[in-house]
Structures are given as structure tokens and as C-alpha cells.
């Protein structure tokens, strides 16, 4: 299949091209990219050979309003003229929800839609005009036309953002949802068109500008609080992925509070509101740690390096239960409430244990009681 993508160097185009390259057999797909740097003479050649067209090229932030016509209407007309005398391939074109508005940008997108519909009438080729709201995700240019991209870029760098109206509503679509739907259309799965003959991405997110800013500031604070966001909320999950893509390249890592002594170290890694706490514990050779029990708190220990023994004794009982553990045989050992327990390094190297607790450590209510096994 030969696919023409106009605007392939743009935000949506880059994501679409990478999805196409990584879906299916690359030997069964040829992607022809048309950008601002592509000689216009190649457009006729591409339009003769293509089986499907993603027309993503357009203008939304021109220096003057005349560029709306040149970038949105004239280019579309030029493309469709080449397709008429070429392969007459199906076309999916990105439009905007602003096409319903009476402004220069909206009028130019509406005119491009009309040209697309006329092409379909003339050639019987299927066409799909997608009216998109704000699109967010990786690779969107900050300080251009996306509030999400700008907020992510600035907050990741501790640059102040401006929120004029926190309650201002905003509807967004996520880039991966957009690209998935576009590819599905190319492969024959098409949704319902609206009364204007246009299509909308099915998965949308309605929120406010203030809510976005609050979430992003919370993401920034994770490096101090260790409290990761709720990933069961689709919008939060997508926004967090987007935020991380805007981190400066010298800012991917951040330090943790490594509590060290002669016995080894203990370091909290992640805290969650509803899934407990994740930590890493290092125990030096010959050292025993623990010697305590919990009323309700419970844990899971996973030794990933070294050799050790985890011992248990039910509070009030005499029997000692032993579980040999090592990094050569990774397994989970549950630490139930009501059992005093310890972990001893019986090897010659550091014993490294990944630990999960069902609750975050609270120094005011530790639920931890000293008692030797």
C-alpha cells in the first residue's frame, strides 16, 4: 500500500508516520512524505502512485490572514487537482472545529472541506474531513497553538504560566487516539459523519484550563513528593505521558533520599494514593534487618540481587519459618500482618530487595512494633 502524507513533518504528521512505520509489515507499505521542503513537482508523481492520502498540511498561525487561503485552500485545491488526474485515491483531511465559526481560519478550513467534497463527487473517491478540537501529545510545538504543549514545556522548566480563566472549558483529543482512528479509517473502519459531512475523533476529553494547570503542577511536584498520579484516569495518564515528553534532555533524572547507615540503605521510590509505596532496601553482608511486626500493614519483598533468608514468627508463637531468597531465583515473599519478621544477608555481596507496602509510611502512625524473630 502506498500512502501519501502531506504535512508529515508537523505534529500530527510525525506521529502518524511513526505509527505507520511501526504497524504491520513495512514491506507492504510505502510512505510518501510531502513537507514544505519537498519539491512541488513531486506532488504530481505521488498523486499518480498513492493508494490513500492523509492530507494534514495546513496553516493555523500565519503572519497575515491571506496565508490561511494559501495554506489551507490553495494547497488542498492543488493536491486534489493532482489526484483527479492521478490515482483518485481516498483522502482523509484534517480540518478544525473552528470550521463552524465565522473567522478567517474557520472560513479557510470550510473552503478546504468543500473542495474535498467536490473531489469526492467528481471521482466517487471516499473522503473524510476530520474536524479536530485541540490535539495534545508528544512533539507538539510549545508557544505556538497548543496550551497543553506550552504549559508542559514551561512547567517542566519552572517557567511561570499564565491562566487567565481557570474555569475556561476546553475539549481535547490525544494524539495516539487521533492516529489510531485515522489508521482505522484507512483500513476500512469508519465512524458516523455529522450533518456537515464531517467526522470527529471518538475519544475526547473535556476539562478546564485550570484543571490542566493543576495536574501539570502536580506532575512537577512528583520529584519531591514521590506521589505518582492515578493512571486509571485516561486523561491523567495521557497528560502525564505528554508532560514527560517535554522534559529538558538534561532533566530526565532526579535524586532520591537514600537513608544509609553501616547496615545498608533504604530508599523510597514511589508513593501512591491507593496502591501503597515502593522502595528499595540494601542490606550489607552479615547484617539482619527488620525484627518488627505490623497490625494491618503488609508488604511484599522481592530480592533481586544477593543471597538471604527471610524469617517469620507469629506474634505469641514459637515456630520460626524461613524462606531462602536470592537474585538467582526471583520470587515474591508476602509479609503478613501479625508476624514479626527479619531479612538477613547470608552472602558475600549486598542483598538488594525491592519492597512494596500496602500503605505509604506515616511517621505519626507507623504501625510498626519492634520484636525479635
Residue ranges of predicted features:
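Conserved beta-loop-beta element that borders a ligand/cofactor-binding pocket
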Residues: 114-141, 153, 159-168, 198
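NAD(P)H-binding glycine-rich loop region in Rossmannoid oxidoreductase-like domains
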Residues: 38-86, 98-102
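Conserved Rossmann-fold NAD(P)-dependent oxidoreductase catalytic core, especially the SDR/UDP-sugar
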Residues: 77-113, 120-123, 128-130
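Short acidic-glycine-tyrosine-enriched beta hairpin
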Residues: 314-337
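Mid/C-terminal beta-alpha module of Rossmann-like enzyme folds, strongest
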Residues: 184, 188-258
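Substrate-positioning beta->alpha
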Residues: 142-150, 167-187, 210, 214
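N-terminal Rossmann NAD(P)H-binding glycine-rich loop of SDR-like oxidoreductase domains
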Residues: 3-22
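A short glycine-rich, His/Asp/Glu-containing loop-to-beta-strand
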Residues: 252-291
Amino acid at each position: 500500500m502506498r500512502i501519501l502524507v502531506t504535512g508529515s513533518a508537523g505534529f500530527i504528521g510525525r506521529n502518524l508516520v511513526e505509527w505507520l512505520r511501526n504497524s504491520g509489515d513495512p514491506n507492504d507499505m510505502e510512505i510518501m512524505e510531502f513537507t514544505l521542503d519537498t519539491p512541488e513537482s513531486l506532488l504530481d508523481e505521488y498523486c499518480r502512485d498513492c493508494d490513500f492520502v492523509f492530507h494534514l498540511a495546513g496553516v493555523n498561525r500565519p503572519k497575515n490572514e491571506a496565508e490561511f487561503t494559501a495554506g489551507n485552500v490553495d494547497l488542498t485545491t492543488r493536491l486534489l487537482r493532482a489526484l483527479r488526474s492521478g490515482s483518485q485515491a481516498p483522502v482523509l483531511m484534517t480540518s478544525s472545529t473552528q470550521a463552524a465559526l465565522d473567522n478567517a481560519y474557520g472560513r479557510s478550513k470550510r473552503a478546504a472541506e468543500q473542495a474535498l467534497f467536490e473531489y469526492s463527487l467528481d471521482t466517487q473517491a471516499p473522503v473524510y474531513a476530520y474536524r479536530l478540537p485541540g490535539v495534545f501529545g508528544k512533539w507538539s510545538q510549545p508557544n505556538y497553538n497548543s496550551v497543553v504543549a506550552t504549559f508542559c514545556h514551561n512547567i517542566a522548566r519552572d517557567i511561570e504560566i499564565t491562566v487567565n480563566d481557570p474555569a475556561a472549558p476546553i475539549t481535547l483529543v490525544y494524539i495516539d487516539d487521533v492516529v489510531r482512528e485515522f489508521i482505522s479509517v484507512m483500513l476500512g473502519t469508519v465512524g458516523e459523519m455529522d450533518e456537515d459531512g464531517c467526522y470527529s475523533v471518538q475519544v475526547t476529553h473535556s476539562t478546564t484550563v485550570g484543571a490542566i494547570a493543576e495536574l501539570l503542577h502536580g506532575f512537577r511536584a512528583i520529584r519531591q513528593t514521590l506521589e505518582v498520579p492515578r493512571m486509571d484516569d485516561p486523561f491523567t495518564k495521557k497528560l502525564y505521558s505528554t508532560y514527560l515528553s517535554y522534559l529538558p534532555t538534561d532533566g530526565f533524572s532526579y535524586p532520591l533520599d537514600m537513608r544509609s547507615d553501616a547496615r545498608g540503605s533504604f530508599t523510597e521510590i514511589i508513593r501512591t494514593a491507593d496502591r501503597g509505596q515502593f522502595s528499595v532496601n540494601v542490606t550489607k553482608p552479615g547484617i539482619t534487618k527488620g525484627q518488627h511486626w505490623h497490625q494491618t500493614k503488609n508488604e511484599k519483598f522481592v530480592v533481586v540481587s544477593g543471597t538471604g533468608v527471610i524469617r517469620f514468627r507469629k506474634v505469641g508463637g514459637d515456630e520460626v519459618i524461613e524462606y531462602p531468597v536470592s537474585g538467582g531465583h526471583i520470587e515474591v515473599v508476602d509479609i503478613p500482618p501479625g508476624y514479626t519478621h527479619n531479612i538477613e544477608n547470608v552472602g558475600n555481596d549486598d542483598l538488594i530487595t525491592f519492597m512494596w507496602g500496602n500503605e505509604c509510611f506515616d511517621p505519626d502512625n507507623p504501625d510498626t512494633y519492634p520484636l525479635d524473630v
